[in-house]
Design a protein with these regions (language model features):
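Helix-to-loop junction immediately C-terminal to a conserved catalytic motif
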Residues: 44
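ABC ATPase NBD coupling module
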Residues: 61-78, 103
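Conserved ABC ATPase "signature" region
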Residues: 108-126
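Conserved ABC ATPase signature
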Residues: 130-134
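Hydrophobic anchor residue at the start of the ABC signature
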Residues: 144
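H-loop/switch region of ABC-family ATPase nucleotide-binding domains
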Residues: 191-192
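Conserved beta-strand-loop-alpha-helix hinge in the C-terminal portion
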Residues: 211-234
Length: 277
């Protein structure tokens, strides 16, 4: 599913234009007060823009009409946040997911719940666990599984790496890759974790002062000089590669993981030394 925001005005944003590409991972990054979450709420139809066009798969929604079925749209666009509502803490995972399914008029289905949990790497034993006993990363996985249980075409993930260590980030990376490649999901990530974004995203929008500062291919964006006047961190691997280029005058293709970069350097050195024919 492709989503286009055309001349959207909402909050402090004026004439915002953005395209979320079908079956791709699009990242939206910016300072904490930049308005990323507002865009996430608009994309997931939880917040109605003041004006502009909201286009889904080339079908234009008239936002001025009162009969737009936002509830129907929420079947297709799932919004996942880190914080679990404290009112759900006493519920078991099964009770929580069953309630959420009922909100979307789905009948109780233990199989659907277990299948969704397995998609995010949680086994069936979790259905009897209370939300309050779960770790932050497990709660996020349950929130994601709950959203996946209604089978949305689009996933909007708000700050998904907030409570994750490096090993759990790697698991999330694999999960997002699975969602995109196997299940053909369109994924939006709102985050400032640029090291993670470099690994997982296809396309990036940078938000600064309630405007789009730059957007494009992840390598073009994260190596852009336009980021110098922002608080956005440059990924460590890009910092290293730029330092390597400055020291050696060797220009290599940008990579999103260390192993590929090391292979490129090794290949270049071997070729220069005559070790490769």
């Amino acid at each position: 599913m492709e989503i286009v925001l055309s001349d959207i005005s909402v909050g402090n944003f004026k004439k915002l234009n953005m395209c979320i590409f079908d079956a791709k991972v699009t990242a939206i990054i910016g300072d904490n007060a930049s308005g990323k979450s507002i865009i996430g709420e608009v994309l997931s139809t939880l917040r109605k823009p003041d004006s502009g066009k909201f286009i889904i798969d080339k079908n234009v929604l008239d936002l001025k009409r009162q009969d737009v079925d936002y509830n129907r749209l929420r079947f297709d666009i799932g919004y996942v946040i880190q914080n679990t509502d404290i009112t759900f803490f006493e519920r078991t995972v099964e009770e929580h997911m069953t309630y959420q399914l009922s909100v979307y008029n789905y009948k109780k289905s233990k199989k659907r719940i277990i299948d969704s949990l397995k998609m995010v790497g949680l086994d069936s034993s979790f259905i009897n666990r209370k939300i309050k006993t779960l770790s932050d990363s497990e709660r996020f996985k349950v929130a994601l599984a709950t959203t996946l249980s209604i089978n949305p075409k689009v996933l909007v993930l708000d700050d998904p790496t907030c409570f994750l260590d490096e090993s759990k980030k790697d698991n999330l990376y694999k999960l997002i890759k699975l969602m995109r490649l196997k299940y053909n999901k369109t994924i939006v990530i709102l985050s400032n974790d640029t090291d993670f974004i470099l690994r997982v995203a296809d396309y990036i929008y940078v938000i600064n002062n309630n405007k789009i500062l730059i957007h494009g291919n992840k390598y073009d964006v994260l190596t852009s000089s336009k980021l110098k006047n922002t608080n956005i961190n440059i990924p460590d691997i890009i910092k290293f590669q730029k330092m390597f280029e400055n020291k050696t005058k060797i220009k290599l293709e940008y990579r999103d993981n260390v192993n590929d970069l090391i292979k490129d350097i090794y290949y270049y050195v071997e070729k220069k030394s005559g070790g490769m024919k």
